[in-house]
Amino acid sequence: MTDPLLIPCPACNGLNRIPAERLADQPKCGRCKSAVLLDKPFELKQGDYASQIKGDLPLLVDVWADWCGPCKSFAPVFEQAAAQLAGKCRLAKLDSEANQQLSAQLGIRSIPSLILFRNGREVARQSGAFPLPQLMAWLRSQGI
């Protein structure tokens, strides 16, 4: 048996200890009873950021804006990736307009931008919209 993974709840930010062998069992948050692992992206906000990047599973953040055409065309690709990566990587969307302070803190210069976090630290960044095979290849190159 391996050490449990620490995974923040996307709904309440509560930190959950989940054994690796139970990741496929759709674990629920001990605090709010919401699903801890989703097969779709969750919304990341300024107040959630510090808690959400700390988890043991990687977190891929799509920084986007409603007025951005490439962001809108990339949204379905990101949704498909979330479904394929459930239990391996968590995916979140950060609205750069609604979270301008966090976007500035992250040094966002263009959108869409993807930022990969692992154990509380940024490990990779990619700008632009691209097809699902290219996104998955980039994530594989990052060890996901």
What residues fall within each predicted segment?
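Short pre-active-site segment immediately N-terminal to redox-active cysteine/selenocysteine motifs
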Residues: L57, W64-W67, S110
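Short cysteine-rich clusters marking metal-coordination/redox-active sites
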Residues: C9-C12, C29-C32
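Non-catalytic, surface beta->alpha helical segment in thiol-disulfide oxidoreductase systems
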Residues: S110, I115-I144
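Cys/His-rich microdomains that often coordinate metals
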Residues: N13-N16, A35-V36, A75
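Typically the conserved alpha-helix immediately C-terminal to a functionally engaged Cys/Sec
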Residues: K72-L85
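A short beta-strand-turn-helix
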Residues: P41-L59
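Short Cys/His-rich micro-motifs in 6-15 aa windows
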Residues: C32-P41
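Short linker/helix segments within small regulatory modules
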Residues: I18-P27
